[in-house]
Structure formats: structure tokens, C-alpha cells
A protein has these predicted regions:
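Secondary-structure end/capping motifs
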Residues: 233-308
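Bacterial N-terminal signal peptides that target proteins for export
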Residues: 1-12
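Short, solvent-exposed loop/beta-turn-alpha elements that line the ligand-binding surface or hinge
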Residues: 60, 211-218, 282-289, 311
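Sec/Tat signal peptide C-region and signal peptidase I cleavage site
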Residues: 23-30
Length: 338
């Protein structure tokens, strides 16, 4: 059940009633008049094909999803917070930001996506241990969660970052790809499927030693499913949605050919690159609350909060709806498990 994060975003936000066809339809679809609309906000990324392709499964639960394109986690949080949508994706650093802003009407109700952002190195530049990064020229996009995870992972692994030539790079992709190819960078941090293009085109590799999401403290969490509390007031609807959400995630996880066809259609990504991306990330409806708390402690250092908001982060998770939908306990759902 694997997949990946951030592709080139669309230049404008637009509302899309998802109409991509996958050649598959769920049995027992509800009558048209019985279908309820749930609005979602997502980036055009690889993090949630099971929401872009939700309707073929959701309709047997009497639900359809309409997607509002958004570029950043902040955009998506704002759409949920203002009631423009019922649900959407946010990042693992988002609960800390919401706590500092005293946001009262958004709760995280499920997991979504793990991995999909990492360090990629140029072929010929050998990296066997984290310490080998010292002396290398590494591109890091400032203000991004991928950049934060790299810094935290490097520190956990005793890298002296003062001995690393860190270059501020863009989150766009093409300039970084060219810089790596030309030898202007030894490596850079970004998200899939941009970094997977490097592997497929043969001039870069994932260093086995140095997965930025492999630390116990901070993990590889990427995207979470959040909801407006007005939507959650209808508990039956919210639980039903989560049942369909889990089933859709499971379906696309077990049918990678359909996933790749779907993602290629709405992102324009090539099948080989998407296949590579799927090796380095995964979907899960479970979350890791402790990772989010640990990340929140680092907020002041990286500037995504002014103060340490870690003591309030757990209050932004309400996994009781997911527990009812799955039959698992809140405690089970609050960690990735073995």
C-alpha cells in the first residue's frame, strides 16, 4: 500500500467534481437522490488518490467527494477552517500552527500519507553514513517540512551541519534537477515524484543510509486528514465517510495499476516515475500523535510557530470517529503500529 507526495501544483485553485474513470465501479451504488456531497481540499499530489478516485467506492455508501485544488498545507487548512470544505489534508506540523492560532473548528480525524519526501544524491557521490553528508553541497528548500525533517534527521544522526554546504533551493523541481545533473549540487531534499525522476533518468539515487523519515522521534509522517467540526456534528455521516475512506485507501493500495492510471491522468506523471515513487512512501489511516508532538517542540527553531505548542497538539486529534469506523481502539490508531 505505497505511494507519494507533491507534484507541480496547478497555478490556480479550481473546483473539480472528480470525474476520472478507472474502469472499475463499486457494487451496490446508492440511488442518485440519496447521495450526499462531501467537499475536500487537496493538492494535486500523490498523497491521496483514494480521495480523487473516491466516488466509485463512496457512492455505495451514499457519498460523493468534490475536490477543491489547493497548493499548500496552509491553503488547505484555511479552506477547512473557513467552512469552504468539510475535509482536507494538512501536514504533521499543522497541529502546532493551529494551536498557536487558537483554531477551534478543525480536528484531525485520520492518517493519510507517510514518506514521499527525501534526500536524493547524485550518482558518483558516495554516501554510506549520515556523517558522509559533511563536506557535501546539499540543496534544501527553506520553510518546507521536507527541509525541516532533513535537518532534524541530520541532527539526530550527529551530523555537524556547519560542515555541510547547505544551499537554499526552490520547491519547483526543474532547477534542482538541472543543478544535480550539472554537478552544481551533490544532493537535494524534495518530494516525490520529482526526486524519483532523478532515479529513473539515471543520474541520482536514494542513499540507503540516510532516509530523512527514519528517526523514531519525528518519523516520516507527511499528510493527515482533517475535518471541520460542523461536519463532525453529524457523527453518522462522518463515520460513514471514514468507512468509505478506509475502503477506498485499501482498494487503491491493492490495485497499483489502477492507482498509477488515475494519478497519471490528473498529474501528468509518467508510469515509470510513479512506480518508483510508490517504493518510497505509503498510505495509512493511522497516525503517529507522538511524532506530531515532537515536531511541535521544534516549531520555534524552524519558525512555523513562535512558541512551543507541543502541549496542545494532542487536543487537535479526534480519532474516535475512525475508531468507530474501523473497530480499532483510539490507542491503536494513534501510532503506526509494528
Amino acid at each position: 500500500m505505497k505511494i507519494a507526495r507533491h507534484l507541480a501544483p496547478s497555478s490556480i485553485a479550481l473546483t473539480l467534481t472528480f470525474a476520472l474513470t478507472t474502469g472499475w465501479h463499486a457494487p451496490g451504488r446508492a440511488a442518485e437522490g440519496d447521495v450526499k456531497l462531501v467537499r475536500a481540499t487537496l493538492s494535486r499530489s500523490l498523497s491521496a488518490p483514494f480521495l480523487w478516485g473516491f466516488n466509485s467506492i463512496g457512492e455505495k455508501y451514499g457519498l460523493r467527494v468534490q475536490v477543491l485544488d489547493a497548493i499548500t498545507n496552509a491553503d488547505q487548512q484555511r479552506n477547512i477552517q473557513t467552512g469552504g470544505v468539510e475535509i482536507g489534508s494538512v501536514g504533521y506540523q499543522s497541529p502546532a500552527g493551529m494551536a498557536e492560532q487558537n483554531v477551534q473548528n478543525v480536528k484531525i480525524i485520520a492518517g493519510m500519507y507517510v514518506g514521499g519526501q527525501n534526500l536524493i544524491m547524485r550518482k558518483g557521490v558516495e554516501l554510506k553514513t549520515w556523517k558522509d553528508i559533511e563536506g557535501k553541497k546539499i540543496g534544501r528548500p527553506p520553510g518546507t517540512y521536507a527541509g525541516i525533517l532533513f535537518t532534524l534527521a541530520a541532527q539526530v544522526n550527529d551530523v555537524d551541519l556547519s560542515r555541510v554546504s547547505l544551499v537554499n533551493t526552490t520547491p519547483a523541481g526543474p532547477p534542482e534537477l538541472q543543478a544535480l545533473k550539472n554537478g552544481d549540487l551533490d544532493g537535494f531534499i524534495l518530494w516525490s515524484p520529482i526526486i524519483d525522476r532523478v532515479v529513473i533518468e539515471g543520474y541520482g539515487y536514494y542513499p540507503a543510509c540516510c532516509d530523512i523519515g527514519a528517526t523514531k522521534e519525528f518519523g516520516a509522517g507527511n499528510q493527515l486528514l482533517a475535518a471541520n467540526t460542523d461536519f463532525l456534528k453529524d457523527r453518522k455521516l462522518a463515520v460513514t465517510f471514514l468507512k468509505a475512506y478506509v475502503e477506498s485507501m485499501d482498494f487503491y493500495g491493492k490495485n497499483p495499476d489502477k492507482t498509477i492510471a488515475l494519478v497519471a491522468e490528473y498529474t501528468g506523471g509518467g508510469a515509470a516515475i510513479l512506480n518508483e515513487a510508490m517504493k518510497h512512501s505509503r498510505w495509512t489511516y493511522r497516525v503517529n500523535v507522538q511524532n506530531a508532538i515532537n515536531v511541535a517542540k521544534e516549531g520555534p527553531k524552524f519558525g512555523f510557530t513562535k512558541a512551543d505548542m507541543s502541549g496542545k497538539v494532542a487536543d487537535y486529534f479526534d480519532l474516535s470517529y475512525l475508531a468507530e469506523a474501523t473497530g480499532q481502539s483510539v490507542e491503536q490508531l494513534g501510532s503506526y503500529g509494528p
